[in-house]
């Protein structure tokens, strides 16, 4: 609460605190370890995907092979492993589809989100490495570089002018008075 009186502005605050107990009290390290290691929810409970939803998503062996290659995993898998991966990827795609379909605020369709979610090999190509000479040249050019986007102007800051004795360090003093 803020009050204005003859002595000026008075500010007073009140503190509100509420406590409630959730679950049993954890007394030992073993109790804490067990509580942290036990799952409290799963995607299967949140979204029950039926066979109709799973069949609406088409995942081929070619897609699984491509995902494995992009992930740098071994592509030599058994038919059982492939079936398991197809099932897992289908469930994930049904989950993502569920998120988009139930988003009432968004009028966009799933295909319009390609700008946000993309996997292009060129995104992961590193640039050319710098040589020592190039790095030293960049360091030498640094004092002359001015970035107007940061509000810098040419000659706006010079460390040598801050110290009247022109020593290679700066001394900052507060204003007297």
Swiss-Prot record:
Organism of origin: Scheffersomyces stipitis (strain ATCC 58785 / CBS 6054 / NBRC 10063 / NRRL Y-11545)
GO BP field: glutaminyl-tRNAGln biosynthesis via transamidation; mitochondrial translation
GO cellular component, one term: mitochondrial inner membrane
Free-text function comment from the UniProt entry: Allows the formation of correctly charged Gln-tRNA(Gln) through the transamidation of misacylated Glu-tRNA(Gln) in the mitochondria. The reaction takes place in the presence of glutamine and ATP through an activated gamma-phospho-Glu-tRNA(Gln). Required for proper protein synthesis within the mitochondrion.
Name of the featured protein: Glutamyl-tRNA(Gln) amidotransferase subunit F, mitochondrial
InterPro entries membership: GatF
MF (Gene Ontology): ATP binding; glutaminyl-tRNA synthase (glutamine-hydrolyzing) activity
Keyword Transit peptide: yes
One Pfam assignment: GatF
Segment annotated as transit peptide: 1-16
């Amino acid at each position: 609460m803020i009050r204005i009186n003859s002595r000026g502005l008075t500010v007073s605050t009140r503190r509100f605190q509420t406590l409630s107990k959730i679950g049993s009290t954890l007394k030992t390290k073993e109790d804490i370890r067990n509580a942290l290691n036990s799952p409290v929810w799963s995607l299967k409970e949140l979204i029950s995907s039926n066979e109709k939803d799973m069949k609406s998503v088409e995942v081929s062996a070619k897609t699984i092979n491509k995902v494995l290659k992009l992930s740098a995993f071994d592509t030599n898998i058994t038919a059982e492993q492939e079936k398991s991966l197809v099932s897992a990827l289908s469930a994930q795609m049904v989950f993502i589809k569920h998120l988009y379909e139930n988003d009432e605020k968004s009028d966009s369709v799933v295909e319009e989100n390609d700008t946000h979610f993309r996997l292009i090999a060129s995104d992961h190509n590193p640039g050319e490495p710098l040589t020592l000479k190039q790095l030293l040249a960049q360091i030498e050019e640094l004092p002359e570089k001015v970035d107007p986007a940061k509000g810098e102007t040419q000659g706006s800051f010079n460390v040598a002018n801050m110290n009247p004795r022109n020593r290679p360090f700066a001394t900052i003093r507060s204003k007297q008075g």
